[in-house]
Structure formats: C-alpha cells, structure tokens
Amino acid sequence: MRLPLLVSVGVLLVALLPSPPCRALLSRGPIPGARQASQHPQPLSFFQPLPQPQEPQALPTLLRVGEEYFLRLGNLDETRAAPLSPAASPLASRSSSRLSPDKVAANFFRALLQPRRPLDSPAGPAKRGTENALGSRQEAPAARKRRSQEPPISLDLTFHLLREVLEMTKADQLAQQAHSNRKLLDIAGK
C-alpha cells in the first residue's frame, strides 16, 4: 500500500518540479524566420504564468486538397491578398532578398485554391486569368445546351458503383492485413 503511494508521489514531484531550461535552445542564436519575443529568453518556471502575446495567435487551419492535408498557420484571408508570382511581390525589387516563409506559404495555398482549367483549352494565360476572376457565371450557351441533352446518371447505377468500390477496398484491406499477419508470423516463427 505504501510503495505504490510513494512511487506515485515521486512521479508527481518529478513531473511538477520546474526543470532548468535547455542549454542548447538558450545558447543557439536567433533562428532565421522565427519570431523572437525578446533578445534574451528567460527560463520559465512551472508556477510562473505564461506571458501573454501582444497579438492573438491564429489557430492552425487544416486545409484538405484532394487526398492530402496541408497545415496553414495564420489568417487564411492573407492567402487571397498575397501575390501569386514572386515578380509581383514588393520584395522582388531587392535582388538579395528572398520571400518570407509566410509569403511562400500564401503563394502556395493561393495556387492550390485557384480553379483548374484543362491544358487543351483555347484561352491564353492572360485570358485564363480574367476568366478565373469572372468565375463560371458566363457559361457558353452551347455548353448549357449540350449538358441539357445528356441523360442524367441513374442513382441506382451510382449506388451500384459505390458498392463495388467499397467491396474492392474492403478486399484490398483484407489482403493487406493477411500479408502483414504473414510477415508477423514469419518474424515470430524465426
């Protein structure tokens, strides 16, 4: 009875006691691109309240693009305001400077969020930009007519295809599980 109590009290003391700051972090100079609150970081005690930042930090946003997830820190409205090309950036006038990581990330996400056009489209790059800006409000009448002539897809066919895809993925998962089980048994058997 006393031994588990002493062990748990010891673990709590070790976990709650303030530890000295990491020397590697204190001795290293400022990291380029990182924001420093002060020139000389002071070690924080566990019982000291955390310093409040001057501006509220934005929570990370998880963007889903296709099957991949991208983590974006900061305001998502900045991505729309950021220039897409480095030549349009105010930093491009200085030849020795590079884009900040925030601007690079903003350009990346802005490029991802732009609508895609097929490569064989007759519109040139300048016209594509204006069409993207206008949106799909002004569709060609021929495209509307062609779409109205196509028969709608049957819901039965859609659900049948969905069922087949689900069965195929389930069979694939079972095959992968059997393969990993076989590997584990081979390792354990040796």
Curated annotation (Swiss-Prot):
<feature type="propeptide">
    <location>
        <begin position="25"/>
        <end position="147"/>
    </location>
</feature>
<protein>
    <recommendedName>
        <fullName>Corticoliberin</fullName>
    </recommendedName>
</protein>
<dbReference type="Pfam" id="PF00473">
    <property type="entry name" value="CRF"/>
</dbReference>
<feature type="region of interest" description="Disordered">
    <location>
        <begin position="115"/>
        <end position="151"/>
    </location>
</feature>
<keyword id="KW-0027">Amidation</keyword>
<feature type="signal peptide">
    <location>
        <begin position="1"/>
        <end position="24"/>
    </location>
</feature>
<dbReference type="InterPro" id="IPR018446">
    <property type="entry name" value="Corticotropin-releasing_fac_CS"/>
</dbReference>
<keyword id="KW-0732">Signal</keyword>
<dbReference type="GO" id="GO:0005615">
    <property type="term" value="C:extracellular space"/>
</dbReference>
<dbReference type="InterPro" id="IPR000187">
    <property type="entry name" value="CRF"/>
</dbReference>
<keyword id="KW-0964">Secreted</keyword>
<dbReference type="GO" id="GO:0045202">
    <property type="term" value="C:synapse"/>
</dbReference>
<feature type="modified residue" description="Alanine amide">
    <location>
        <position position="188"/>
    </location>
</feature>
<dbReference type="InterPro" id="IPR003620">
    <property type="entry name" value="Urocortin_CRF"/>
</dbReference>
<dbReference type="GO" id="GO:0017045">
    <property type="term" value="F:corticotropin-releasing hormone activity"/>
</dbReference>
<comment type="similarity">
    <text>Belongs to the sauvagine/corticotropin-releasing factor/urotensin I family.</text>
</comment>
<feature type="compositionally biased region" description="Low complexity">
    <location>
        <begin position="41"/>
        <end position="53"/>
    </location>
</feature>
<dbReference type="GO" id="GO:0070093">
    <property type="term" value="P:negative regulation of glucagon secretion"/>
</dbReference>
<keyword id="KW-0165">Cleavage on pair of basic residues</keyword>
<dbReference type="GO" id="GO:0001963">
    <property type="term" value="P:synaptic transmission, dopaminergic"/>
</dbReference>
<feature type="region of interest" description="Disordered">
    <location>
        <begin position="33"/>
        <end position="53"/>
    </location>
</feature>
<dbReference type="GO" id="GO:2000310">
    <property type="term" value="P:regulation of NMDA receptor activity"/>
</dbReference>
<keyword id="KW-0372">Hormone</keyword>
<dbReference type="GO" id="GO:0032811">
    <property type="term" value="P:negative regulation of epinephrine secretion"/>
</dbReference>
<comment type="function">
    <text>Hormone regulating the release of corticotropin from pituitary gland. Induces NLRP6 in intestinal epithelial cells, hence may influence gut microbiota profile.</text>
</comment>
<comment type="subunit">
    <text>Interacts (via C-terminus) with CRFR1 (via N-terminal extracellular domain).</text>
</comment>
<dbReference type="GO" id="GO:0051464">
    <property type="term" value="P:positive regulation of cortisol secretion"/>
</dbReference>
